[in-house]
Amino acid sequence: VVWTLSGEVAGYFPGKPRETAIKGWREVAKYVEKMDGYGTLQTAHYTNERPFADYYYDESWFDFVLNQAGHGDFPINPSWYRAYRKEHGTKPFIEGESLYEYCSTLEENGTRLCTDAMLRRVAYMAVQTGGCGYTYGAQGIWDNIWEVSDINPDFNAFNKFGITWAKAIDGPGGAQMGYLKRFYEEHHFEEMVPYEPAEMEESISPFANKLAAATISRDKTRALIYYGE
């Protein structure tokens, strides 16, 4: 069991509305922390502020970050997660909402259907760069679409391809998340730490974000290497 505050905690309106939302959910979090006698982990569903939102980090109730990298894969890259770890290395993170299977991507160069390959890339990337996991989601399920006629044409940023619950439940990406889980359990991902490329190599190379994402065991006897392409 995990307490997850809200959804899009801060909202997307700057200034006072944002401040009010952050403050209001903070009060909810403190109340949950006070009333929960079981030490249940608590987090908040971050807004999509690529790479990471900037609130709650140092607060005692905030046990781990539930990030939202969002639903367009072109900008998402390992340097986001590496930069987060350098700044907030003691606060665990999970990639909580990125590239739900079958969603309509939000990208400047046009909408695409999110494939299993796209979500697999960000899932492995997040874990290989120090994340504790990835939260899988699928269009048609989270928005409760039983029939194509259920789609609201006036509020339909993410389901432009007519994805229903029946199609989404058998999405190949869901099965592949099972492979991901078994792989990391078998290889004890908790014993691995991210391998960080040299600062200079990462900053000057135009291909830096295409480098393999690698983790190594603390005794340097094992390595897990992921190539995103």
What does each of the following model-derived ranges do?
Residues 17, 21, 73, 111, ...:
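Residue-level preference for long, well-ordered alpha-helices that form the structural scaffold
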Residues 1-95:
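Active-site neighborhood of glycoside hydrolase catalytic domains
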Residues 13-15, 52-55, 105, 146, ...:
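Short, solvent-exposed polar/charged micro-motifs at secondary-structure junctions
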Residues 18, 26, 50, 82-85, ...:
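Arginine residue identity/basic-tract feature
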Residues 42, 49, 77, 110, ...:
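Generic preference for well-ordered secondary structure
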Residues 101-103, 117-229:
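Aromatic- and carboxylate-lined catalytic core of secreted/periplasmic carbohydrate-active enzymes
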